[in-house]
Amino acid sequence: MIPGELFPAPGDIILNAGCETLTLTVANGGDRPIQVGSHYHFAETNPALQFDRQRARGYRLDIPAGTAVRFEPGQARDVTLVPYGGRRQVVGFNGLVNGQLED
């Protein structure tokens, strides 16, 4: 064995398997690119992003951890979101929740 060596199981890794998903169309109405990270509370993203924020409450992007989606000025695209799991507590970001999400 080599220190740090990984022995992954055979087959593909399915991200967020079995999670409910939500697809929203998001447009960048600003004049600069906006990047959103994998675990950012999507409802609290940059206000220049135009989408149904109420529907996005309690959701994050359905992308691999540590990655991000970039929205160029004037660009609109569909994104897939998954709900926060665990205790469903959202703290920080833009300070709009800072506690337990209502279900």
Swiss-Prot record:
GO terms for cellular component: urease complex. One of its GO terms (biological process) is urea catabolic process. Its main location: cytoplasm. GO terms for molecular function: urease activity. Pfam families: Urease_beta. Pathway: Nitrogen metabolism; urea degradation; CO(2) and NH(3) from urea (urease route): step 1/1. The keyword Ubl conjugation does not apply. It catalyses: urea + 2 H2O + H(+) = hydrogencarbonate + 2 NH4(+). It is an enzyme of class 3 (hydrolase). The keyword Transmembrane helix does not apply. Belongs to the urease beta subunit family. HAMAP family: Urease_beta. This is Urease subunit beta. It comes from Magnetococcus marinus (strain ATCC BAA-1437 / JCM 17883 / MC-1). The lineage of its organism: Bacteria, Pseudomonadati, Pseudomonadota, Alphaproteobacteria, Magnetococcales.
